[in-house]
């Protein structure tokens, strides 16, 4: 079945996901429709991605077999009120909003719906995202597998209980920002040590990518991999000790906890 895929809202995360979908060999651009708030942004979506775009949410709601709700959380209730009577009965509704629960969405629709709450992250735009998905009780196994096949286009995914979404948001949803800060700090250090800035960024980025890939492909504990780099009395252990002395681990743990707390209180 060639399902029609709709997006209501297309901010940074929506664009990351849309970008992955239009690159997929088995999804036609003719089967994707996007609504945005302004005519200018709709035209930009059409120009950049080659998909049908509109400013009319109801148009997307009527057409979509798979409906991504990609608006900001504080617009969610308003958008659902606008489209709830127009969505197809068998449509799979996919939420990507942080802090908006399955129960809230079901309550706002006020009827039985097929719903999957998800949380992707921005590396989805290059096919290296990490997403969490949580289906409601109306989603069949085949439908969940289909949603999973979409999220495989964005990278990898895990089916999680909704109670674990706060931890996931802190660990994966927001963590690209932490990693980019780390890359920036490493590159700044490289510049301070005399490297050209472009080369410093390239080196830092590849170091992060390679380290993550090494951990994933070897399955070794990161602590073991760290120890393998540290020679007795060498340069690496000197840097590691300085990071420990300055509270590197505790700073990261505290930041992740703060992020999770914010998610719980949204």
Which residues does each predicted region cover?
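Small-residue helix-packing motif on alpha-helices
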Residues: 32, 42, 60, 196-204, ...
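NAD(P)-dependent Rossmann-like dehydrogenase/reductase catalytic/cofactor-binding core
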Residues: 205-266
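NAD(P)+-binding Rossmann beta1-loop-alpha1 motif at the extreme N-terminus of oxidoreductases
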Residues: 1-55, 62, 128, 191-192
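Internal alpha-helical scaffold of NAD(P)-dependent oxidoreductase catalytic cores
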Residues: 104, 108-114, 130-167, 180-217
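Rossmann-like NAD(P)(H) cofactor-binding subdomain of soluble oxidoreductases
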Residues: 39, 48-49, 57-62, 66-133, ...
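Short pre-catalytic strand/loop immediately N-terminal to key active-site residues, enriched for Gly-Thr
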Residues: 5, 116, 165-170, 222-227
């Amino acid at each position: 079945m060639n399902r029609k895929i709709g997006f209501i809202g297309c901010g940074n995360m929506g664009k990351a996901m849309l970008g992955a979908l239009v690159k997929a060999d088995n999804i036609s651009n003719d089967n994707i429709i996007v609504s945005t708030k302004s005519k200018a942004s709709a035209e930009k979506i059409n120009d950049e991605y080659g998909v049908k775009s509109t400013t009319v949410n109801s148009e997307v709601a009527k057409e979509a077999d798979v409906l991504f709700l990609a608006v900001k959380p504080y617009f969610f209730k308003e958008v659902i009120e606008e489209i709830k009577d127009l969505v197809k009965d068998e449509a799979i509704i996919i939420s990507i909003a942080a802090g908006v629960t399955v129960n809230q969405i079901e309550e706002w629709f006020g009827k039985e719906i097929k719903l999957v709450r998800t949380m992707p992250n921005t590396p989805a735009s290059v096919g290296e995202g990490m997403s969490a998905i949580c289906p409601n009780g109306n989603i069949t196994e085949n439908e969940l597998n289909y949603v999973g096949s979409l999220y495989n286009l964005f990278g990898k995914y895990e089916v999680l209980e909704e109670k674990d979404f706060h931890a996931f948001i802190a660990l994966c949803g927001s963590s690209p920002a932490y990693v980019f800060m780390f890359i920036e700090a490493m590159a700044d250090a490289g510049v301070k040590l005399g490297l050209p800035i472009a080369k410093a960024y390239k080196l830092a980025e590849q170091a992060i990518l390679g380290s993550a890939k090494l951990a994933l492909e070897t399955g070794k504990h990161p602590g073991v991999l760290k120890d393998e780099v540290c020679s007795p009395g060498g340069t690496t252990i000197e840097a590691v000790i300085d990071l420990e002395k300055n509270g590197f681990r505790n700073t990261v743990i505290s930041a992740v906890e703060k992020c999770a707390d914010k998610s719980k209180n949204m």
